[in-house]
Amino acid sequence: MNISIIQNNNPLSMMSSVYRQNQSQDTNLPSALTIYNSLTGAKVVASAYQFHNLEALKQFIGMSFNVATENLFLLTPFGIKLKFSMIVHEEISEIYVFDRRYFNVNNIEASGNMDNVNDLLAELNQTDFINMIKPLASPLLSEELSVFVEKLTLVLENTTQIKAVDINLNMLRMLLNSLKRNSGWASALLSDFKKTVAFDECTPEDNDLETILTSLNVLIQYVGLVFKTLEKKFNDSIDALVLLQSNSLVDQWRDQYALLKRIPFEFKSGSSNVPEKLFLSQLVNESHLDKCAEESRRLNKSMNERLVMLRSKIEADVIKPRQELLQEYNGYMSQYIRPETDATQKTQKIQDCKRILAELEVHVSKLIQSSSSLPSFEELITTASQTSTTLSASSIANIKKLTQLYKYQESELVPYIFQLANNLYDIQINKLNARKELQTKLICSTLINITKIQLNIMRLSTVLNTEVAKNIASIKENELQLSVVSDLPLMFGIFVIANLNNLKFGISLNNIVKKANEIFEMLRFMESRNRAKWLKEFLASSGADKVEFLHLDEEARERFINENMLSYKLEQVDAIRSKKSPSPVDHPASPVSGQEKHYLTSINRLLHNINGFPAPRPTATELPKQRETNIMTNLARNISVKSIVSYINTLRKEGIDLNIVNRLEECLKDFGITYGAIERKAIETEDGEEIVVKGKNAGDLGTFDVNDVNYMRLFKKFIKSFESEGIVININVNQQDSVSNDELIKGYERRIRKLENVLHTRNFQQFNEQWSRHRPVHTLPNPVSRRQSDMSQEPAVHENTILFNENVVLGRKTIDLPPSHYGERIERLEKENERYRGEIEELKKGTDLAELDRLKKEIEDLQKADMEKDKRLAALEEENKNLKESNEELTNSNKELVNMCEELKSMKSDLLENMTQKESEFGKEAKVNQQEINELKLRIEELEEDESNLVNVNKTLNERLAIKDGLLCQLYELVQGAYGKLNQMSGEIFSNLTRVCLLLESIGLLLIRETPSFDNHPGTLTIKRVKGLRSRKRQIKQASDSTHNGNLQNDTFEDSEHIDNALMEVVSSEVVPEAEQYLHWVDTNVLNYTISSDLGIEDEIEHKKNESSLIDMSLCEESSIEKKVKKLLANYESFNVEQGFQNFLRFNHVDNELVIERVFRRFSDVETLARKLQKDKTQQKQELKMLTAELDGKIAFRNFKVGDLVLFLKTLTPANEELGGGDEQPWAAFNVGCPNYYLKNTKGEGYIELSDRDWLVGRVSKIEPRQVTEQNFHSKTENPFRLAKSVVWYYVEAREVKE
């Protein structure tokens, strides 16, 4: 038996054992990935760290399994498609590889074409690198040799003196060579079966079957996951349809529409002041809603039918085939994965294989031992003398020995060895055939069924994603159109409230503009008055009449006062803005974020949370455009609180949901709009009349003060907009009730307007006195002192300004007015004096008597107190004497303290003089220091500018350096990759040289050097025909094994065990070991200093990028990358890589023309031999055909089988005894040692007429064995011939042969 390894249909070599190309089987690799081929069972183990992306993994798998990258389909356990993130996170350790070509849709149509299946199986065999070849016949089994030996035997027996011409020397040489080749043939068979026959219970073929079925299970799980996706889509479609149908408004929208007809919205037109009424039913299109309802009914009916049809389609095309697929998989498991009950049978088979192999080894040893003493051809043709042609006695004896050896091997050893080899071959081929059978079933049936299921799932998914999804979307759109009828009261209410809020915003903005105008005007007025007063005082106190440039006329005075006093006044531009503002654009409603501060935030959030539906289309756009535009425009411009309140009351009256009514009321309150009872408040004027004060509440739009939230939001934004760098404005709101304050402010404003004329006539004299009361009078004014005086007077100035008055709070204004003139002030004071006098007189009249009684009681109390005081006086006099004495002592001490105080005062005066002197010195020193500080600041600015320039230069240099470092890193990586590829390429070149030598040696040629090599210069190569390569290889292998193992085995075991390595692995040519010396010219020490192994260059580059703003003083130093470059160049020169490369090329180079010429010449000889063998083969086929025809005409008499020609004769047993009274006697086959073969001649087709006949010649068509047991011993049908118990007999059906 021989096994040929075939790649791309070209025989690479002849091997005597199964060869399988496995990359790596080490499962202990870090993050090992086990990759399985789903159709061949092959396995590859690789480390996950060597793959940087999914494309690299696919390229590795494609090269390992000979599958194109675009045809790869990768699955993980449990049927999940492979993602590269699973490998990165080490979530998987197994990958199953499928070829997309076996899942092609075209395979479904060509499923009955066996040619296509055979092509796919042939590709699998090529991919698996296994091709079993049946054991070849022995070289001795040749008819030509048999005839020659018979003739030679006759010559040897009948002739005493044999001449050379009496013997065919060519045939004698052929006989000798055949005996030599026969031992090699037997050794090769034994070596083959020792390596191919497995003695373990788990063989590689069983592992392949298990891997194939496991891959099929993974594929079935993948189909299940795809089906679950389809099932989820189908269930989601049903749920969506059921939800739409349960909440459908097809039958309820009419009632809602009738309710809209009873809900009006009343408002007055601005131009004609005529009340208008708008019913909500005018905002929707009834005909369009009717069409939507009808369309929704039709789609619901069609969708119900469509989903029912899809369900039946899924059950028929997906669910049922999946169940059949699972049954088919279970059948494969029970058929090819042997259960544990077969363990005994499996053990028995292993024992049989061992027994057959042991017998084969014994007979091969006998054959090799018998062939060990074969004579040479010269010993067979030696003559008696040099001049004689008669063979010598020794030659005749050798020829007789040769013929005897031939007969012994040809008759006894070779047939038995060949039979044992065929038995082992059958056992081994059955294992491979089981896998091939499973592959055929998978390709012909299972994979095609899986492809059909996937195709059906894709088609059904397309229907669900397109037709069903589109219809459900249409139903949803129609339902949204119908939902507008129920949502319209809320939507319209929110819209009109928003228009009302816009109106309020305009009023609020107008109030803020007016207030800002007043403030700006007041500031201008106060500044002009201050300038006039200052100019007057300056001219009066500085002696302006003595200086010519201060002689100012009226025009110069006015220019000084009014220069740079520009008027900043805000004006309303409502008309211009309304003309230039673009028309509003309708945008679809979108969800509003909760963090958005906008007055429509609550509205949008409310609309989006009503029912969870997207914004419906504005149905109102389908109404007549002119009428709708006029109505909506008038409504937006003339909206009022009263109209909205009336609308809300109408909704409540018509029974609209209270949630809608409450939401509208909440929206109204959120806008700061009140619509409750209006509080009337009256105040009395100076003239005695009573008026009603509403404050700033314009038409119930709000109070526009601190209690109005909406107004305060806008007012705070306005005030906060004045913030700038270093200035923060904090707004504190007074929580007092502002209604009464507003009424009071209204009264003050009326009084202010009455007093304006009086104030203007007196030219604001009181104001000037008040503003200038804190200003120094007799100082020389200059711009610096003027600014200082302004700053010192700032609190006083701010006392009477509106912006800085402490009494002014937000929403309330109080102004303290000075008296208009002295007369009015005197008159007011006299009135207050008279009022106080009257009060004093009234108090005197009512309190005289009470005062008298009180005084009497006090006198009595005083008398009692005097008596007690007299007693105490005596005690005090004594005490006084003592105190006088102590007083004198204190007086003396006091004088001393006075003296000490005078001394301290003098010291204080001296200290004050010293402090004054030091202060003057400190002032001078401070000026000097200030000058130095100014100079240093200028210097600092210059240095900062220089620093910024240096930072920019440093940044640019760092960027360039980082780019260069990156380029050097890339060059390092390229060098590293180039070294690795050069090393790999060197190995491939050396392997090619080894393959060339092995190829030449396999055809009997040897590559040698004619001249010896010296001083790294190879000698001349030549190819010679050499005999004895087998023995030479055997010697080399034995020598290497003895070197490694230290012991030698017997020759027989050595020849049988290592013959494969001697033929395929051992190279006899001395050119290969000579070239191997120069194989490692790429010294790996050059790569010891790579980018990733030294000095942290990436960190250095990153550090430079992060600190690019600083001045890097290490730019002038030599970087670590530069050091590594120099070290790499030094290593390159020291290791002499160039010389090694040249030596490697010289000693690995083989001339192509030399090889081609010698191989072509050798193959010409082989082709000549092949033609001769083919001619012999044709002749043997013809002889075999003649012998077969001759054998078919001979009658068999033992070991009957179907197709044999048999002679049937009547038995001597009476018919009635055998057949129970039948008319016919039984017929039996003529035999020698094979009894009980009876003819079965049943009536019908093939019946033979046996009457009046003594014999019958027929060809056996069927043999049916029977056995007589105790149960059927008396049965006429089971034992018609009354044979003894336990006798085995046979029913033979035959066809009569007449010619």
From Swiss-Prot:
PANTHER family: RB1-INDUCIBLE COILED-COIL, RB1-INDUCIBLE COILED-COIL PROTEIN 1. Belongs to the ATG11 family. The keyword Coiled coil applies. Homodimer. One of its GO terms (molecular function) is protein kinase binding. It comes from the Eukaryota. One of its GO terms (biological process) is protein transport. It is a peripheral membrane protein. Involved in cytoplasm to vacuole transport (Cvt), pexophagy, mitophagy and nucleophagy. Recruits mitochondria for their selective degradation via autophagy (mitophagy) during starvation. Works as scaffold proteins that recruit ATG proteins to the pre-autophagosome (PAS), the site of vesicle/autophagosome formation. Required for the Cvt vesicles completion. Residues 294-367, 820-962, 1164-1194 form a coiled coil. It is found in: Preautophagosomal structure membrane; Vacuole membrane. This is Autophagy-related protein 11. GO terms for cellular component: Atg1/ULK1 kinase complex; phagophore assembly site membrane; vacuolar membrane. Keywords: Autophagy, Coiled coil, Membrane, Protein transport, Transport, Vacuole.
